[in-house]
Design a protein with these regions (language model features):
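Local sequence-structure signature of Cys/Sec-based thiol-disulfide redox active-site neighborhoods
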Residues: 1-22, 26-31
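Thiol/selenol-based redox catalytic cores and closely related redox-interacting motifs
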Residues: 31-110
Length: 110
C-alpha cells in the first residue's frame, strides 16, 4: 500500500497511527514532494468526484481561488492542477492494489 500524506496534517497522522496499530505495511509518500500521479488522481476522481479531491481548507486553495474556478474547470484541468501541487490535494490518499481511499474514514480503512 502507498499512503500519500503530509507530516503536519492531523488527519494523516491518524491514518498512519491506525495502519501501524493494524500492522499494515505501507510506503509513506510526502504528498507535497511527490503528488499522486495523474492516473491515481483520475481513479480517485471516479470514486469521490472532482471537488472532493481538493484540500478546501488549504492556504493555496484559497490563495489560488480554486473554489471560483471549479465551476468551469474540466476534469483534465483539475487533474493537471492537482498533479502539479500536492498541497491542493485532499489527504491522505491510500492506494492499495485496486482500491483508492481519499481522506481518513476508519470504516473505509478496515
Amino acid at each position: 500500500m502507498k499512503l500519500y500524506s503530509y507530516n503536519k496534517c492531523g488527519t494523516c497522522r491518524k491514518a498512519i497511527q491506525f495502519l501501524e496499530n493494524k500492522k499494515v505495511k505501507f510506503e509513506l509518500i510526502d504528498i507535497t514532494e511527490t503528488p499522486p500521479t495523474k492516473q491515481i488522481l483520475k481513479a480517485a476522481m471516479k470514486v469521490k468526484g472532482m471537488k472532493k479531491l481538493f484540500n478546501t481548507s488549504g492556504v493555496q486553495y484559497r490563495e489560488l481561488k480554486i473554489k471560483d474556478k471549479l465551476q468551469t474547470m474540466t476534469e483534465n484541468q483539475a487533474v493537471d492542477l492537482l498533479a502539479s501541487n500536492g498541497r491542493l490535494v485532499k489527504r491522505p490518499i491510500a492506494v492499495d492494489k485496486n482500491k483508492i481511499t481519499v481522506g481518513f474514514d476508519i470504516e473505509e480503512y478496515k
